[in-house]
């Protein structure tokens, strides 16, 4: 599990630069509720030139030992007998200071929760990339980048959770004198959001705030320390509960 989250978020595909397209995708964890089949994801461009963005999707398959593999899906253009997540459109042209959206559509089996990595990758458009621009526009864009000295293309990776059709939450709490544990006995991920571990008498003496996803049949726990307080928000789908524990 821990390795999965290290790949989430901002990643650099080349060197370092300030000019050119600079995309953002908002939150890096998205959740599709059991009664929904589509989700709109917006891509923002805060840069100085147009961003040509490819949307790539892999399914995350977990093994019994907790390790996982990322499996490529079928061709985005084919929806025949599809089982997985697709982006429409899978190619975005986002103007400077503008925003464009792609619709993430799930088709297939929802008896259990499924997980996908969605990558938003800015590229220098080539003919095979299937962006709706002319050959001359492609060449003009390349020339513009060279003249501006742009050497970086920065993209984002997000994790997309597809909840089961019949979503059921069942979080079991085990709170004893020395240890606190949450165990997920439901069939969909629950979230421990903004987990804070702070000194009881010093409000600003806190360890780094963290976020944890508790998968089905997994648990999250921590040892209580005297003189410390633990605060977080437990999120089960649309339900949120603030929890405070004293060490």
Regions found by a protein language model. Give the residues of each.
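Beta-sheet-dominated interaction scaffolds and their linkers
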Residues: 20-49, 166-175
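Intrinsically disordered, low-complexity segments enriched in serine, threonine, and glycine
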Residues: 174-247
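Short acidic, flexible loop segments centered on an aromatic residue
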Residues: 51-79, 121, 187-202
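Positively charged n-region of N-terminal signal peptides that target proteins for export
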Residues: 1-4
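Asparagine-centered strand-capping/turn motif at beta-strand->loop junctions
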Residues: 43-49, 106, 180-188
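Intrinsically disordered, low-complexity Pro/Gly/Ser/Thr-rich segments with frequent PxxP/GP/PP motifs
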Residues: 73-109, 203-229
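Bacterial N-terminal signal peptides
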Residues: 7-15
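Terminal connector regions
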Residues: 58-60, 107-167, 230-247
């Amino acid at each position: 599990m821990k390795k999965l989250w290290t790949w989430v978020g901002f990643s650099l595909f080349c060197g370092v630069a300030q000019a050119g397209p600079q995309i953002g995708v908002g939150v890096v964890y998205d959740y599709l509720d059991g009664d929904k089949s589509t989700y709109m994801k917006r891509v923002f461009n805060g840069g100085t030139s147009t961003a040509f963005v490819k949307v790539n999707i892999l399914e995350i398959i977990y093994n019994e030992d907790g390790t996982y593999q990322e499996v490529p899906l079928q061709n985005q253009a084919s929806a025949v007998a599809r089982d997985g997540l697709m982006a429409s459109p899978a190619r975005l042209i986002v103007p400077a200071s503008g925003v464009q959206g792609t619709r993430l559509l799930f088709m297939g089996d929802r008896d259990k929760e499924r997980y996908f990595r969605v990558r938003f990758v800015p590229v220098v458009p080539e003919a095979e990339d299937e962006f709706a621009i002319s050959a001359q526009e492609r060449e003009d864009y390349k020339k513009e980048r060279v003249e501006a000295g742009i050497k970086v293309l920065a993209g984002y990776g997000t994790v997309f959770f597809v909840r089961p059709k019949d979503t059921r939450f069942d979080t079991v709490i085990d709170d004893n004198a020395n240890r606190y544990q949450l165990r997920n006995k439901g069939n969909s991920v629950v979230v421990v959001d903004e987990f804070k571990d702070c000194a009881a008498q010093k409000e600003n003496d806190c360890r780094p705030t963290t976020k944890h996803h508790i998968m089905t049949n997994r648990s999250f726990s921590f040892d209580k320390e005297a003189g410390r307080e633990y605060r977080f928000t437990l999120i089960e789908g649309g339900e949120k509960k603030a929890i405070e524990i004293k060490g």
